Amino acid sequence: MAHDRKNSTAGRNLSLAISAAVAGTGSAQAESDAEDARLEEVIVTATKRDLKLQDTPLSVTAITDEEITLQRLDNFEDYVGQIPGLALSQREPGANSVIMRGCAAQGLSFSDSATTSVYLDEQPITSAGYNPDPRLVDVARIEALGGPQGSLFGDAAQCGTLRIITNKPDTSVSDGWLDVSGWSIGEGGAGTDLSGMVNVPLLEDGSSIYPDLKAAVRLVGFYANEPGWVDNVLTPTPGQTSTNSNRVDDDVNSSVWYGGRAGLRLEAGENWTVDLTGIYQYYEMDGFGDVSLNQQHFADTSVFPSFGPHDQARYTEDYWEDEWYQIALTLEGNLSFGDVVLTTAYYDRESTYLADSTSYLQNFQQVGDYFRSFNTGNPYYDTGGIYDFGGYPIANDFDGRQTNNWVIEARYATPTDGRWSAIVGAFYSKRQVDEVFMSNVEGLTGTGAFNYINYAGYYVGIPMKSASNNWWTGVYDSDLKQSAFFGEVSVDVTENFTIKAGGRFYSIENDYIVMNGTLIGMNGGIPNCAIDYCYAPGDLGSSDENGFVPMVNFSYRWENALVYATYSEGFRRGGANSARPQSVFGPPSDLFDDPAGTMNSYESDTVINHEIGAKTEWLDDRLRFNISYYQMTWENIQVQAEDPQDNIFTLGIVNFPEADIDGVEMWVSWLPNANWSIEATVGRNDGELSQAQTLFADTPGAIPVPVGTELPIVPDVKRHLKVMYQLPRTLLGGEPYIMLRYTYTGESVNSLAGIESISFSPPVVQQGSWRTLDIQAGIETDAWSASLYVDNVTDENGELFFNNRFAQQRLTVNQPRSFGFNFRYNLGGK
């Protein structure tokens, strides 16, 4: 949340990083400063070269270290409003989908591959629906690359790439800072944030053996205790047989973050650099920040409470824990014949959650009651018995996931001082994901569900031997290997006109294993199909894929302008669904009749992008206006849907024919004079299905999805405005300022026609527009800085996401109005 972070570094100009100093005490000085003020040149690495942002013929949004610090940006939610093409489908930090340019086909993603890649330095850490949320402490830059980036960034860079780039050790200076923040949420608790950084050169003058060798270390640490603002209120269970009195609590979505980074840099002369970096982060949340709604089970307000904007009803513990680390090594050589880079990184993540699923299991109970009405008298044929939890279940879900990923990339870039230049490289990654999911029902032993499974066990010679609350367990493992060769060549046809062409040859292998069933090991664990009641034992096999994605870019430069046109493609790998064999998504099998197993595999999908844009500077570099217009065709879309068969309740991926996505992105930066700075971004996006689809056309549960069906999650309009005024006189020996930020998020829908939850038919919701206003005032000196702020001044209650996951629809909301302070002490150096 944007309520606990840093003010600007001491000595930094606060007016949008104006390169000339603007502090003055008289009108003559102010006029001189106005003439000298210039917008800062931001260097980005979006093309895997160091280029000025205004010289990069791509749609790139860059948020610098100074702006991250000044605006107190901590995580995805804090900066999503500033990037025109970026959207989030968020349940909680560490469990969200990052979406660029409208490439979303479902509200919640449980698939294996995303449409937007997320990079931490040189390594992809993308995880569809489960993206980690690196805390932005001592981060050099955020880069958001709009549109397909498949040629340089590969799989999942289908519609864009989000890059988080950390600061590296500096061998030239000792530097550091200490930072403390505190804040209070008007309808919640109070929080604190402590962080610090130390940079120390070790060999400034080299050594006797290697006189040109320099070294430095950079150490970063942080701890944050973030308050909650959602209350778990006293509520009867859906069956009205008990209440959640033992779980009632205030501010249940409080959280703790801590972690750090250690970096070592070696510089051998001016040509060679080695960086070794280790990053660690831990995140724990005591409850989820989604609220309950008076609909479905809770519709009767004569029985259930009338929920307020920050109220929820939970009957078991909600909990989220996310822990990960990354170790990375990068070697860079700047040689006479070009630049070479060799980078490798290892990433390891463990995440666990508990989630109340009482309302969800109550829906299953009602389905079971319906099927049991057709019982023939033989308990084995009581097909609804497996959902008989005694009438009024209290239940929770457990999920534990471990991910490790190793990548290596080598690339060579030619010098750029001639008429042509090129970059070529090779990439390899190996990722393993092991996941265990359990659904647990209190007092399951003795219920109809237990008796049904026990009877079935006797029937097949595997009787149950002990009591258990474990109703369902799934184990889902995958091993993914990717390799690629990529390259781009640029030719200056004239002094001003450049053509760039490139592409990526890729090869992907993915092996899947799924096991799921009931009463697993009686007391938890993983399925052992020799003794447990299994649905899908064993190896699901593998999927292999090879292909090529191209890119062509044309750019023309004037003195203060650049125009460009791009054709590019992005891809997302195909695969196989992890489902039980009765499902249409299950593995092919002779055990069940069609349609079982008929939709087990799904193909890769492709985005074809046509884009034009311009980057311009005016008024002696005091006004910057950039714009990009894109038309994208999304072919063979991977869509998450629920099996339409009765009594199956299984999700899988299917391919839809096509969608069209059109949009505009705009960026404005303006320095009216030495004291004012204004920044604005605007994004418009329109995505819809361009071909009709009848989902499950050959089954009784066929669902027509018409042309014009809106793609979910991404708002139709986004606007962000930042205005800053720096007072012309000093105060307490420093430079005082006032800053306002305004963010508008337009309307969107939460689901693609509701197809990911067919059985319980939660409504497709139009998520309303919302806006926030933040005000901050501060002072900066060479030695320290301080600020006071109010976030969400108008106490806007934004509808972030209507979550259909647990059948009982929930709403994720933004943080209410908060008041805070920040103090930073500079330890010296720059």
Give names to the regions the model predicted.
Residues 76-77, 97-99, 119, 144, ...:
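N-terminal periplasmic accessory domains that precede
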Residues 370-409, 466, 599-603, 609, ...:
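Outer membrane beta-barrel strand-and-loop segments of large Gram-negative receptors
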Residues 229-251, 286-315, 356-398, 438-475, ...:
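Solvent-exposed loop segments that connect transmembrane elements
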Residues 195, 328-335, 339-357, 557-568, ...:
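Membrane-embedded beta-barrel scaffold of Gram-negative outer-membrane proteins
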Residues 175, 187-288, 402-408, 413-429, ...:
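Transmembrane beta-barrel wall of Gram-negative outer-membrane proteins
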Residues 108-109, 116, 121-148, 196:
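Short acidic/polar hinge/loop motifs at secondary-structure boundaries
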Residues 673, 743-755, 778-830:
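C-terminal beta-signal and adjacent terminal beta-strands/loops
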Residues 495-499, 626-634, 652-752, 822-829:
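Gram-negative outer-membrane beta-barrel transporters
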